Amino acid sequence: MIVGLGIDIAELSRIARAWERHGRRFAARVLHPAELACLPAAPVAFLAARFAAKEAAVKALGTGFSQGIGPRDIEVRPLPTGQPQLVLHGKAAARCAALGATATHVSLTHGRDTAAAVVVLER
C-alpha cells in the first residue's frame, strides 16, 4: 500500500547558477555527507537530480522541509547495479516510520534542461 508519493522537477540552469555562485558550499548544504563524497567534477546534473529527489521525498513524507527535516537528512545512494536507493536519516527516517512505510522507492532522470525525481513510500 502506498503511504506517500512525491514528484519534483529541478531546472539545471537554476542549479548551475547556485553552483557558480556558491560552489562546494551549496553542495554541502544540499547533499548528505556520503553524497558529497561522490560529487563528480561536472556536478550540475548530479546536484539537480538529488535536489529533485529530496524535494520529492519531503512531499511524500508530507512535511516539506520543516519539522526539523532538511536536505541532508535525505540521501540518494547508488546500488551496485547503479539503481538509486533512497536512504532517510534523522527526523526524515522517524517521519517515514510514523507513516508505517517499510519500503522507499526513488526514480531519477535528467535531460538537457531539467532533472526530475519520483519518490514512493510503501508499507
UniProtKB/Swiss-Prot annotation:
What InterPro entries does its record include? Answer: 4-PPantetheinyl_Trfase_dom (IPR008278), 4-PPantetheinyl_Trfase_dom_sf (IPR037143), ACPS (IPR002582), Ppantetheine-prot_Trfase_dom (IPR004568)
Keywords, in A-Z order:
Cytoplasm, Fatty acid biosynthesis, Fatty acid metabolism, Lipid biosynthesis, Lipid metabolism, Magnesium, Metal-binding, Transferase
Binding of Mg(2+): at which residues?
Answer: D8, E55
Q: Name one GO molecular function term.
A: magnesium ion binding
What is the protein's major site of localization?
cytoplasm
* Localization per Swiss-Prot or TrEMBL: Cytoplasm
* Obligatory cofactor(s): Mg(2+)
Report the catalytic activity. apo-[ACP] + CoA = holo-[ACP] + adenosine 3',5'-bisphosphate + H(+)
Kindly report, in one word, the top-level EC class recorded for this enzyme.
Answer: transferase
Domain of life here? Bacteria
Taken from the UniProt entry, a GO cellular component term is: cytoplasm
Q: Which SUPFAM superfamilies match?
A: 4'-phosphopantetheinyl transferase (SSF56214)
The record ties this protein, via Pfam families, to: ACPS (PF01648)
Name the EC number(s). Answer: 2.7.8.7
Query: Which cysteine-cysteine pairs are annotated as disulfide bonds in the entry?
Result: none
The GO biological-process annotations, alphabetized, read as: fatty acid biosynthetic process
Q: Which HAMAP family match?
A: AcpS (MF_00101)
Q: Which family does it belong to?
A: Belongs to the P-Pant transferase superfamily. AcpS family.
> Per its database record, what is this protein's job?
Transfers the 4'-phosphopantetheine moiety from coenzyme A to a Ser of acyl-carrier-protein.
User: What protein am I looking at?
Assistant: Holo-[acyl-carrier-protein] synthase
